[in-house]
Amino acid sequence: MYVQKQFWQDLKSGKFASMVSDSAKGEILKTPSEVFNVMKPMFMENDDVESIYGIFLNSKNRVKAIEKLASGSISSSMVYPREIIKRILALKCNAMILVHNHPSGCPEPSKADFEITVRMAIALDSIGSTLHDHIIIGDSYYSFEASGWMEETRKKASAIIAL
């Protein structure tokens, strides 16, 4: 019982967040469920506020870094494409996966979630990078890619950039 309680306290404290981030480097996350399993512990430290993470990928889609991009309130957080572009360029990444949590436990995307996904897809396309997915984590997860929405968004982003 003590081991389980200690593990839970360590998980809630964020102790494992850096371990998760470090151990994911060089790995390929092939499915939204793999992203969910890797990222769920990252949200345990502050599970009562919305936080946004970026999984930055190299040209072979291997994880270069996992970084917290923003934290907000119980129902929202704000991330600026400009700041993410700066990180993509600094890390010399070709793509990324955007991941955030919904403290309510319901992973269904909000209007703001759709809007930031479009803005990020356009911003990344404009510098020759790709937003592979945007995953929302709650009790389960929602993947914009698995829903089919991401492919259409990338097409629209490319069309806008081509103008």
What is the role of each PLM region?
Residues 1-17, 25, 58-60, 70, ...:
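Active-site-proximal loop/helix of nucleotide/amide-processing enzymes and allied scaffolds
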Residues 32:
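Acidic-basic catalytic patches of nuclease active cores, encompassing PD-(D/E)XK
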Residues 27, 35-77:
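Mobile, glycine- and charge-enriched loop segments
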